[in-house]
Every structure is written in C-alpha cells, then in structure tokens.
C-alpha cells in the first residue's frame, strides 16, 4: 500500500475512534383525554411538578397533577388541535421566563413572549417563575419610602421599599388609578416598575399601556398581560412571572415595584384550574391551598440585607370586594398576608372624595419607618386628626348649634384638610409640595380660606413657591427633612402668599 493510502486508512481509523452517535433521552407520553384547557397524559412517569411539556405544533403545557399512571397538565394556548393519542414530550425545564433590563418598556405574556409588536426581546437571563422566598436572615427592615405622589397615602399610610401593601375596594373605586399614579410618579427615579394585568380585557390593557406611554412611565415599566381571552393557565402564571422579573432587579441591588391587578381574578383562575383538575373544593369552591397560592407569591417581596446587595421588591396587590365585604374568603387571606391595606370606600368615591381612602380601616404596618423626616414631622398626627374629624362629622349631621367653639373649629379644619387630600387622577404631587401644603393646612393657614377655594389655594401655592421660594422646596427634597431654617423660610413664604391672596 502506498504512503498516501496508509494516510487515508489512519485518518479513517481516527474518525471511527472519535465517532459517537449523540443520544438523548426524552420522556414521552400520549394524550388520553383533552378538553377545557386540560390534557390527561399517560406515561411521563418522571415528570416534575410545574415542568414544561411540549404538545404537537409547539403548544406548551405545565404538569400540575402527578398521578400514579398519568399526568394532568394545563395547556398554555389553544387546545383545538390537540387530540387523543398525540405524543407529548417532557422538556425537563420548569416553567420559566426571560428577565433583565432588555424587558423594560415592553409588554409581554407570562412566558416572556412579546405582545407589543416591537420584535424579539434580547434575553439576558432565564429565571423560574416560582422560587422560595428570602428567609428572615436574608432580609432587612423596611426604612426607605416608595413615593406614590398621592398625598393621602404618603402622609397617612406610607409604603416602604420591600413592603406588601394591599389596595382593596369595590369595583370602580380607583384601585388601579392609585397603582398607576405610583408608577407614573417614579419617572426619573431609580424604581423599576412591573404592572401585571390578570384577566383584564385586552382593550383595557391597551389603554393602560397608552396612558403609561403618554406620561413617560414606560421608560421604567414592564407590563405582563394575561388577558381574559387567554388560556386560564396563563392568568394563573401571570403574577409569578411579574414577581420573577422583579426579583432579578432586586438581586442586582436595585429597587423594583410590582403591581398585581388583580389577585381576585387570579384566585378565580386558580379555582377554575383546580376544579378542572378534579381537586376537592372547599369554601366558596376554592381549593384548600388558595391561601398558599397568594402567600408564596407575596412573601417573595422583601428588602434584602446589605450582604445580598440591599435591593428590594415592593408588592402592591389589588383585591376587588363585593359590596364592601372585606371579610370574604380571598380578601381576608390577602389582608393577613400583607403588611397593611389601603381601603377605598364607594360612598366616599361617589361623594367626590378621591382618592377615596378610608383612613379608619386603612393601615400601614411599617408606619412612619417608611416616611421621610419632613413628612413625619408634618403629618405625624394627621391620621388621628382625620379619624377624629370623621367621627365628629358623623355626629354633627344632627346639627352643630350646640357644639362648642373648639369642636366647630376642628370640623372646619377637617373639611379643609379633606379638600387638601383630594387629588386629580394621574397628577402625582412631589414630596416637597406635599409637605408644604400639609404644613399650611395643619398650622391654620387655610382656616380663613373658603372650602370651595382650597384647591385653588393649593395650586396657587405650588406656583408661588416654585417662582419665589424654590430654595425651600429644594432643601426639603435634598435633605428629606425640615430644618429650623427651612421651616422659618416656609412660614415666611406662606405669610407672603396669604398677604397677596384674595380669599
């Protein structure tokens, strides 16, 4: 054999030695029953809970019931083309979503697929939708405020970074408006916002996105949408997807805010899934683990300690009540999980007091720890004063002729403070401006102003301060406190403003 032939033989032998047919093991099952978005699959004996399964045509599903000889899975899409006998593959992956800065400004579904027509999302990291919440050692006490821009909330029910604050009330009482105001108020700040729309009409989600774009809030916001027309499984996954996106920012040492709008529809979706999966129903036909459904979600909101970067994830879950019944099953569950609640009252809303925050029922268990020193100094007694005013106002309905002078003055001032706390929708007020108007209201500068002219007084005061005493507002913003010098300057400003004001 020639030298060239020997070379060819040696090359062939080397290639034979290196040859190894790639072999991959895939767990495969077959559909034995399908309907109502649920597929029962024979086989897949090694499937894991929450594992992604692949159906023909690229439709995905999630294994939720692991039985002795079958698996029940929820289908994440249209089940019209899935039929008995179809092959189902286990992917070996737990339900997950792409996360990272590339998602800011985008609208996605709970699986991270874009819904806004702006092209594919640059995937930076993939995270599981569910994970164990940070333990006690990993956490740090909440002491930094989330400025909502809403006077009634920032003054009386402060929200801290890392807190879980429930927004609860009847239909159309302004729950979503409070959440959107809070998102809009973060413009130019360092808080990344995630808005999770669960079971809403697509038109309403589109209006919300357009509103956020109008106010420049999409620059720091991610929208996760599972519409009412989507598969119920996607509605079930939506809040976990939003939480996973927020956790990525938290673990990078940043601050994030996630709004779940709303967890009532989330509980309905889970109830529907559970009944279709033939799990035993309990109270109001909810499954026995409906409390765990929300506790494992909301416990993931936290303020991490400095060793872990000091990031935070703040949760604003929304619950819709029926006829003001806060003692129903799901509302009481979520109230017991969260660190406080903002209760919106229909009667107050209908009487023109908006935001319709009922101070008596609303509470923030973090309290003044999450307030700036300036707001704490000005508004420390505001909640108690407003509570007393409401009681007096109810009593005074029977007539004020026999009330003493001090009580009548308290009623008069309470009316003016109520007017001050009113606020237009999507008009967040900067913290320094809030401090200025509340200082004026609580120190008698509004006592001589007619109730009907309080709103004009307020808007005029903001313009006057910005034009003539901008340094006062700047000092309050910069120091987050009111020094003796700043307070003196603020008093001078208020005196000058009142002198030039015709009331």
Curated annotation (Swiss-Prot):
Regions that span the bilayer: none
First-level EC class: translocase
Entries under InterPro entries matching the protein: ATP_synth_asu-like_sf (IPR023366), ATP_synth_asu_C (IPR000793), ATP_synth_asu_C_sf (IPR038376), ATP_synth_F1_a_nt-bd_dom (IPR033732), ATP_synth_F1_asu (IPR005294), ATPase_a/bsu_AS (IPR020003), ATPase_F1/V1/A1_a/bsu_N (IPR004100), ATPase_F1/V1/A1_a/bsu_N_sf (IPR036121)
The keyword Transport belongs to this UniProt entry's keyword annotation: yes
Catalytic activities: ATP + H2O + 4 H(+)(in) = ADP + phosphate + 5 H(+)(out)
UniProt: ATP binding residues: 169-176
A Pfam family reported for this protein in Swiss-Prot or TrEMBL: ATP-synt_ab_C
Membrane-topology annotation of the record: Peripheral membrane protein
Major localisation: membrane
Keywords for this protein: ATP synthesis, ATP-binding, Cell membrane, CF(1), Hydrogen ion transport, Ion transport, Membrane, Nucleotide-binding, Translocase, Transport
Keyword Metal-binding: no
EC number(s) reported in the record: 7.1.2.2
Feature type site, description Required for activity: 362
GO molecular function: ADP binding; ATP binding; proton-transporting ATP synthase activity, rotational mechanism
Subcellular location field: Cell membrane
A GO CC annotation given for this chain: proton-transporting ATP synthase complex
Family in the record: Belongs to the ATPase alpha/beta chains family.
Subunit relationships: F-type ATPases have 2 components, CF(1) - the catalytic core - and CF(0) - the membrane proton channel. CF(1) has five subunits: alpha(3), beta(3), gamma(1), delta(1), epsilon(1). CF(0) has three main subunits: a(1), b(2) and c(9-12). The alpha and beta chains form an alternating ring which encloses part of the gamma chain. CF(1) is attached to CF(0) by a central stalk formed by the gamma and epsilon chains, while a peripheral stalk is formed by the delta and b chains.
Record-linked NCBIfam families: atpA, PRK13343.1
Function: Produces ATP from ADP in the presence of a proton gradient across the membrane. The alpha chain is a regulatory subunit.
Protein name as catalogued: ATP synthase subunit alpha
Taxon lineage: Bacteria, Bacillati, Chloroflexota, Dehalococcoidia, Dehalococcoidales
